[in-house]
Amino acid sequence: MKLSQLLERLQYEVIQGSDQIEISTLINDSRKAEEGAVFVCISGAVSDGHRFAREVAEKGASALIVEKEVDVPGDVTVIRMQDTRYALALMSAAYFGYPAEKLKIIGITGTKGKTTTTYMIKSILEDVGHKVGLIGTIEAVIGEKKIPAANTTPESYTIHQYFAEMVEAGCDSVVMEVSSQGLMLHRTAGIPFEIGIFTNLGHDHIGPNEHKDFEDYKRCKGLLFKQCRLGIANIDDPWYEDVFRGADCRVE
């Protein structure tokens, strides 16, 4: 696959090298570096992928996706983006052949009730004949396979990997939990949700490692409703109007 194919839905600047090179795999973990890989440098809460740019290049990576300057050999392609987390999401979709576009995806967000709601919807859809995948706090379910979950909403690469496996397994629908962290960190960027569901909002997840304040928490929850066709609101929740403010979807 050419690097340019992974970048086709992104705006970017070629700092050195060429976007026409062939790449072997897409990674954002420096420990997985290999010959021909494209490495997406992400600045995280614990470490900054840009610090490992030279190490990854020395292991044979062909290209780096960066937000900051990096010092690597001239034969390594360097592509600069405004937001590498967002880039990883769209590149992952391209890498797996845009599997989300072959599925009807329902996303559930809210402080409480996401897990229960996903299993209820999965059961209802299966009862009327759909084959349904699931991604959530407890596990991902792909056909008969169950994969224990590390995060409520996995990293974008993993999400699209699961979507691709679901398509291969014959699924036509997916129900997934969408956390505020997942939305804030662009893990779900570019996913065409058919339906977004809001359960409720409480004062959890406020702190230095999550959301700086309740306003930020509300704003991040609302991001789901900028990328779905239909939003379903729990109007008994006092914050539902704030969450849906600025929504781009039809709301019921």
Could you say what each language-model-derived stretch is?
Residues 6, 37, 56, 91, ...:
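Residue-level signal for inorganic ion chemistry
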Residues 146-156, 204-212:
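Flexible beta-alpha connector loops of hexameric P-loop NTPases
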Residues 150-179:
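Conserved nucleotide-sensing/catalytic segment adjacent to the nucleotide-binding pocket
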Residues 1-90, 226:
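N-terminal leader/targeting and accessory segments in enzymes
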Residues 71-75, 169, 194-252:
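Acidic, Mg2+-coordinating active-site environments of NTP-dependent enzymes
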Residues 93-139, 145-146:
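Walker A (P-loop) phosphate-binding motif
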Residues 33-34, 68-76, 141-143, 186-192, ...:
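Short loop/helix-cap segments at secondary-structure boundaries that form the rim of catalytic
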